[in-house]
UniProtKB/Swiss-Prot annotation:
Species of provenance: Xenopus laevis
Family: Belongs to the NAD-dependent glycerol-3-phosphate dehydrogenase family.
Enzyme class per UniProt: oxidoreductase
EC id: 1.1.1.8
Gene that encodes the chain: gpd1l
Name of this chain's protein: Glycerol-3-phosphate dehydrogenase 1-like protein
Principal subcellular localization: cytoplasm
């Protein structure tokens, strides 16, 4: 497969993380002949104080709703029409909430040329009749293109502020992974490419469940020792889940990359899932209410992923093997007391 340069890039999504990535790509392509100098970014159109969000981004070069305070390069062009945004794109960067991936892929299927490559930055999983489905699998099936994944300890505002961090690209085709590394790497955004792509992607989804448990601990003022236990036992459940559900062999080394333990730590200390879970305990409000209040209406991935994982575990009759994942689901959706997160640790199979 040979893509003729300069390669056109389209970012499918423009939330907090999508806008931070747009800032990186916009700056990078200016200095590289391999990539086209204009970057399309699909924006779900919204009205902000009577003005269209796309108009604000294209004139003021700032996503004032989802990444305020950070200027986007002028070569990043916001487009409200998804088909227009992806037209003629060689490289597609998927960065939308995971529940919208089916609709987006259906809309652009057949409208992207057959040699295009995708990379998903979406942290979530889906479920089908056979159980677990990865987001990359859905894109691959619906669009018939090769798809890599990027996951890591990457809190969007810190990335946009150009604070140093690492990330992991998982790609079953190493050359495709290296191409995306070339597009995305900066002195402060360092990338490792591995071929264990399914594990990389699962890490990105499952760590959000663990972060919700960490937030519950913070809400209960459990202390750092308990939170460390949540992180360790959460990591053990992530590894066990990957071993059961990944089609290809799982490398434990992948969990030591940025997508694994590093992302888990940063999310359990600094991410939105932790923050909202703590507020859930302290305020008694529902997850939905807190999303509106604290996230500008953006969706929290951790509780949703816990529900999908729970249903998959039920299908396999394995709920009891994953007490931390199960407790998060039951606290979020079944009204179980938050203290159950502690009792699930006390009787965790890791200690038996």
């Amino acid at each position: 497969m040979a893509l003729a340069g300069p390669l056109k890039v389209c970012i499918v999504g423009s939330g907090n993380w999508g806008s931070a990535v747009a800032k990186i790509i916009g700056h990078n392509v200016k200095n590289m002949k391999k990539f086209a100098s204009t970057v399309n970014m699909w924006v779900f159109e919204e009205n902000i104080n009577g003005r269209k969000l796309t108009e604000i981004i294209n004139t003021e070069h700032e996503n004032v709703k989802y990444l305020p305070g950070h200027k986007l390069p002028e070569n990043v062009v916001a487009l409200p029409n998804l088909t227009d945004a992806v037209r003629d794109a060689d490289l597609l960067i998927f960065v939308i909430p995971h529940q919208f991936i089916h609709k987006v892929c259906q809309e652009i299927s057949g409208k992207v040329h057959k040699n295009a490559l995708g990379i998903t930055l979406i942290k979530g999983i889906d479920e089908g009749p056979e159980g677990l489905r990865l987001i990359s699998d859905i894109i691959r099936e619906k669009m018939n293109i090769d798809v890599s994944v990027l996951m890591g300890a990457n809190i969007a505002n810190e990335v946009a502020a150009e604070k140093f961090c690492e990330t992991t690209i998982g790609s079953k085709n190493k050359n495709h992974g290296l191409l995306f590394k070339e597009l995305l790497q900066t002195p402060n955004f360092r990338i490792t490419v591995v071929e264990d792509a399914d594990t990389v992607e699962l890490c990105g989804a499952l760590k959000n469940i663990v972060a919700v448990a960490a937030g519950f601990c913070d809400g209960l003022s459990c202390g750092d020792n308990t939170k460390a236990a949540v992180i360790r036992l959460g990591l053990m459940e992530m590894i066990a889940f990957a071993n059961v559900f990944c089609k290809d062999s799982v490398s434990i080394a992948t969990f030591l990359e940025s997508c694994g333990v590093a992302d888990l730590i940063t999310t359990c200390y600094g991410g939105r899932n932790r923050k909202v879970a703590e507020a859930f305990v302290k305020t008694g409000k529902s997850i939905e209410e807190l999303e509106k209040e604290m996230l500008n209406g953006q969706k929290l991935q951790g509780p949703q992923t816990s529900a999908e994982v729970y249903r998959i575990l039920q299908q396999k009759n394995m709920v009891n093997n994953f007490p931390l994942f199960t407790a998060v689901f039951q606290i979020c959706y079944e009204g179980k007391p938050v203290e159950d997160v502690i009792s699930c640790l006390q009787s965790h199979p890791e200690h038996m």
